[in-house]
């Protein structure tokens, strides 16, 4: 952090412009705004003095320095500091948030990923303030609607319809907790897995084959069959319509052709089918016939004790990857997007934080005569992380919810709140 950035933070706290600030450390004036705090020897918890020079010949602060801690709040009295902090908890200062985004690349990347609209206006203070306040207002409206709904449920908890809604809240909390556990213990399940390809040769023509043990037969596209010079061997009597996720036209079958896998030359039959962007798909008929083993630990297809390594992601041709990158997606109610073919999560749900349960249903019941209780998980994140977020002006509940949504990642939680 530079002296110039520190003056901007002091300005956001005190409304004193940087041109009127004179920072003093160990009775020495910090006049070079381009230097960093480390270069001038300022460390965590050190005390600085701020001399304020007023324009228009007004008397300046006579020899009295206004003490301020790095990242802290300056003020004349303890009561004013407490009041100012309470006000910041209610309305976080947009300029302080903006400077924090610009000063930390990790936070900036997290905000760009979670809130691109806000990240795009981070360099414009006025536009940033407008966008942030608009988003906060919409969030407050949603919270107010949620609280109003919860209050209505609390008014008549024995109503059967209210019980159904309470049950749904409990279910949503369980789903959210399951999501958090999955993100914490095996986050790789939310990523996209590279498909299995191996280099092969068919009738002397080199190509990359997609290994798919879920396909019943080995499939080849008409263009690939033409390039391999085996289109003339297609038996149209085996034509038809293939039905699955969609429909495709089967032109026929090549009963036998030579395929080279590794150093082995093997006989193989191909079903020529339209509608496939993949040139060659090795199905279960081919794999079972030659007793192939998909060894994921070795990252290879093993046939007759010979291992043929799968292609790495960088070795797979781009047009083959685009086949799965451009796949149709299924959208959920909260904005989650899941690939229709691969099942990969391409966009996580927006409402990942658990919905707060009604206050009257917060405790577990011991008898069946009482209405169902809504369990709200207790905070399980370090107090240091919560304290760093509350220093930015957010409440403790907001900090806890953000850490839950970000799976404990401090930078991600700050980006989620911003």
Curated annotation (Swiss-Prot):
One GO BP annotation of this record: protein transport
Which residues lie within the region annotated Disordered?
A: 58-89, 346-382
Write down the CDD domains for this protein, in alphabetical order: RP_DDI, Ubl_Ddi1_like
UBA domain: residues covered: 380-418
GO cellular component terms, alphabetically, are: cytoplasm
- Predominant location: cytoplasm
Compartment(s) = Cytoplasm
What EC number(s) does this enzyme carry?
A: 3.4.23.-
Query: The Ubiquitin-like domain covers which part of the protein?
Result: 1-57
Record-level Gene Ontology MF annotations: aspartic-type endopeptidase activity
- Give the record's keywords alphabetically: Aspartyl protease, Cytoplasm, Hydrolase, Protease, Protein transport, Transport
What enzyme category does the UniProt record give? hydrolase
Quaternary structure and partners? Binds ubiquitin and polyubiquitinated proteins.
The UniProt similarity line reads:
Belongs to the DDI1 family.
Q: What role does it play? A: Probable aspartic protease. May be involved in the regulation of exocytosis. Acts as a linker between the 19S proteasome and polyubiquitinated proteins via UBA domain interactions with ubiquitin for their subsequent degradation. Required for S-phase checkpoint control.
Descriptive protein name: DNA damage-inducible protein 1
Which organism was this protein described from?
Emericella nidulans (strain FGSC A4 / ATCC 38163 / CBS 112.46 / NRRL 194 / M139) (Aspergillus nidulans)
- Give the gene that encodes this protein: ddi1
